[in-house]
């Protein structure tokens, strides 16, 4: 099995959502997890211990395993992410331009039929999930 398949099969059984993962330089495997209510250090330790054993059995090669929350600017990958975070601001980069534009910063209005609706500068744009190259939440800080 590949890393993504292992993570997608293992994490939900432990009560966590796979947000993203990356195999970085020098063999560091970073896994970003989430759950309702947020992630604690204990959650990261639990997942790390469990995945270490699973990866050993599956003979997945890596030097270091890092488990982390996705952070305030978490990536948005699936339709469910855009539904969950409707009403929040995001930065979205598309693969192909829409109206001559590839970068959008605005409020997520929702996601239906694999199409994300974003409002910005008094306009609304619809972006197909397949056209999204990168999307991240853009947290607002109020002082």
UniProtKB/Swiss-Prot annotation:
The keyword Cytoplasm applies. Pfam families: DUF150_C, RimP_N. It is found in: Cytoplasm. GO terms for biological process: ribosomal small subunit assembly; translation. The keyword Cytoplasm applies. Keywords: Cytoplasm, Ribosome biogenesis. It comes from the Bacteria. InterPro entries: Ribosome_maturation_RimP (IPR003728), RimP_C (IPR028998), RimP_C_sf (IPR036847), RimP_N (IPR028989), RimP_N_sf (IPR035956). One of its GO terms (cellular component) is cytosol. Required for maturation of 30S ribosomal subunits. NCBIfam families: PRK00092.2-1. Belongs to the RimP family. This is Ribosome maturation factor RimP. The lineage of its organism: Bacteria, Pseudomonadati, Pseudomonadota, Betaproteobacteria, Neisseriales.
